[in-house]
Curated annotation (Swiss-Prot):
It catalyses: uridine(54) in tRNA + (6R)-5,10-methylene-5,6,7,8-tetrahydrofolate + NADH + H(+) = 5-methyluridine(54) in tRNA + (6S)-5,6,7,8-tetrahydrofolate + NAD(+); uridine(54) in tRNA + (6R)-5,10-methylene-5,6,7,8-tetrahydrofolate + NADPH + H(+) = 5-methyluridine(54) in tRNA + (6S)-5,6,7,8-tetrahydrofolate + NADP(+). It is an enzyme of class 2 (transferase). Its EC number is 2.1.1.74. It is found in: Cytoplasm. One of its GO terms (molecular function) is tRNA (uracil(54)-C5)-methyltransferase activity, 5,10-methylenetetrahydrofolate-dependent. One of its GO terms (biological process) is tRNA wobble uridine modification. This is Methylenetetrahydrofolate--tRNA-(uracil-5-)-methyltransferase TrmFO.
């Protein structure tokens, strides 16, 4: 008798995982605590409820990484994309949906599937046996959070998410910036040049502080707390404590020499640190912020060297429950210490509806394949889905791991293409062409049981 797959959480990831597994011929029990146990953000007990925006972002599958993710999920027969297409609204090049019709359709479709049973009620522990996928999202209940923390170690589960902006390396002006660790610390050349530095003189620093203090800020949402951990103070809060605070904190200029102007000591320095193994993404160190997105881009582009910066992710601080996935999950999305349990969706450290659904798609297929005795590896990191799972299962730096949207900085480079802004269109088209080919190969590579 074929084993039943249990999936906890009926959001984007859990709904997609249930659909994919059931379509592969596996019986699924989908556990959803709503409406019996609610959250401060959800309004209904529907599956696939969109609690924030109603946008799935860009639908451009040639020049945009999230649009490519749309394409991959459609090619895999994804439920979330099918329902989004069915209920899409006019939104230019973006994919926006009627959130109520979308969630109702997801619920109705899953309820009608002969292999899916939906059980309403809270799951508050990690079962010792059976195949399970936990896709409980950033609003995981306190009881289940405690159970996950007990299994993974308390430090592995974050409850307050401090996010610094991430910049594409090829958009940084290296005629103004340079690579150097403070005091040239490190045993290897790579360690001694681990940070990217952007210098400021006194006038530039004062103008930056003025812009920071004047920028529009996002207010905390209902259910969030305004108490900060000292280790993740927003930069604007630090600036409010004194105009020199940042210059003696994350922007201190000590231990650094600007090779472009070796005789001029910077008044302040903004440091960026590599955020992925490919070296295509750099995060701005200590720059977690509650500034609104438009204000962030304007303020951060006043930093010398970042005038033309392109951002893979803007900063923010909000409550978020997520695993330190690079240390805890394998490429099959299994908990290394409990391989009968997989995680999917935002709790794995991806950010966004589409990314969450994509991780649900992958977890559902991988779990179903294991149950059916089918050999199925994770997709190549040249695909959007594969790039995400590679990032969260080890490609990201575990010590600085934070939730991530899909972006081309996660993809391995295509050889022989021009770098920089001028070559971007051809480069992105090469990424998406390669991804589509490799994704189709992955979809066709499922082997029958021996």
């Amino acid at each position: 008798m074929t084993q039943t797959l249990h999936i906890v959480g009926g959001g984007m990831a859990g709904s997609e995982a249930a659909w994919q597994a059931a379509e592969m011929g596996v019986d699924v029990v989908l556990h959803e605590m709503r409406p019996k146990v609610g959250t401060f953000a959800h309004q209904t007990g529907l599956l696939g409820e969109m609690v924030c925006s109603n946008s799935f972002r860009s639908d451009d599958d040639e020049q945009n990484a999230v649009g490519l993710l749309h394409w991959e999920m459609r090619a895999a027969g994804g439920l979330i994309m099918r329902m989004a297409d069915k209920h899409r609204l006019p939104a230019g090049g973006a994919l926006a949906v009627d959130r109520d019709l979308f969630a109702q359709s997801v619920t109705d479709t899953l309820t009608a599937h002969p292999r899916i049973t939906i059980e309403y009620g809270e799951i508050s522990e990690l079962p010792a046996s059976g195949q399970w996928i936990f896709a409980t999202g950033p609003l995981t209940s306190s009881k289940l959070s405690d159970a996950i923390a007990a299994q993974t170690g308390g430090a592995a589960l974050a409850f307050f998410d401090a996010i610094a902006p991430i910049v594409y390396f090829d958009s940084i002006d290296m005629s103004r910036a340079w690579m150097q660790s403070r005091y040239d610390k490190g045993e290897t050349e790579e360690e001694r040049t681990a940070y990217l530095n952007c210098p400021m003189d006194k006038d530039q620093y004062e103008a930056f502080i003025d812009a920071l203090l004047a920028a529009d800020k996002t207010e905390f949402k209902e259910g969030e707390t305004a108490d900060y951990f000292d280790g993740c103070l927003p930069i604007e809060v630090m600036a409010e404590r004194g105009r020199e605070t940042l210059r003696f904190g994350p922007m201190k200029p000590v231990g650094l020499t600007n090779p472009h102007q070796p005789d001029v000591k910077p008044y302040a320095v903004v440091q960026l640190r590599r955020d992925n193994k490919l070296g295509t993404l750099y995060n701005i160190v200590g720059f977690q912020t509650k500034m609104k997105y438009g204000a962030q881009a304007a303020v951060f582009k006043t930093i010398p060297g970042l005038e033309n910066a392109s951002f893979a992710r803007l900063g923010g601080i909000h409550r978020n429950t997520f695993l330190n996935a690079p240390t805890l999950l394998d490429e099959q999305m299994r908990l290394r210490s409990r391989p009968n349990i997989r995680f999917a969706g935002q709790i794995t450290g991806v950010e966004g509806y589409v990314e969450s659904a994509a991780m649900g798609l992958l977890a559902g297929r991988l779990a179903a394949a294991e149950i059916l005795g089918i050999s199925l590896s994770a997709p190549a990191d040249t695909t959007a889905t594969g790039a995400l799972i590679t990032h969260i299962s080890g490609g990201a730096e575990a010590k600085t791991f934070q939730p991530m949207n899909v972006n081309f900085g996660l993809f391995p480079p295509v050889e022989g293409l021009k770098g920089g802004r001028r070559g971007r269109k051809d480069r992105y088209k090469a990424y998406t062409d390669r991804a589509k080919r490799d994704w189709q190969n992955w979809l066709e590579a499922v082997k029958e049981p021996a």
